[in-house]
Amino acid sequence: VHYVSACRHDGIPVLSPDVNESGTEFTATKEGVRFGLAGIRGVGTGVAQAIIAEREAGGPFKTLHDFVERVDSSQANRRVIESLIKAGAFDSTGYPRRQMMHFVDKNNPENIIDAAVKRQKDRASGQTSFFDMFGDVEGSGFEVSVPDPDGQEWDRHLKLSQEKEVLGIYVSDHPLRPFEYALAKARDFSFSQIDTGYEVQNPTGGTINQEIPEGKALWWAGMVSSVSKRVTKNGDPMGIVQLEDMEGEATVVVFPKTYKEAEGYLYGEVD
């Protein structure tokens, strides 16, 4: 979160992972810093390297169908592909994430992963199909059957929550974006400033970093991202609360007395 915040503070865009552009780790591009494939939960370095190797050997992936046909299913299995979709790694192909998840849904009898696995097994056993004898994927019937993008995307909240699930942070957007101005007005400092300090003008010129004094009371504004309810030895409820703003996050322990007073405010979500 702090890395992303620092880049954005310096005017450097942080871009979602992309199967056609990402490296294994963060990569500098003309447009900004591209999130690495290995940083996606459930993908890992080995799978990322296999994807990059196929991209370099066969060129950019045209569609999700093209991807599952070309990348070994033992490397990029259903779980990996679902994580890539949630992370936005196929967004550049022009298909909504919702539609692509339907393409790979195991409950979809026409899901493309089962079809690709069968084709790869047939090739490995020397059983080539009629179409395979006449050319590559583009002429095989697999690519021809790809439907057009339907334009039906998940709602913003679901899309972002799944993105954070696999990336650990929000990259393409943030749930608090519509409230950014109001939050800045309501708070004294952001979590990033609390953690690393903030810039102030130097009387002799330029800026210097000013740290926030220990023990200083201040106002903070953001959202509760998770609450873990605990019970003390005396049986009193308390909470471990994860707070988050657009620049950072922090874990706060809410002891029984305060928890009893604030419990009703510690649940809910920003749409």
Across the structure, where does each feature detected by a protein language model lie?
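Sliding clamp-binding short linear motifs
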Residues: 1-211
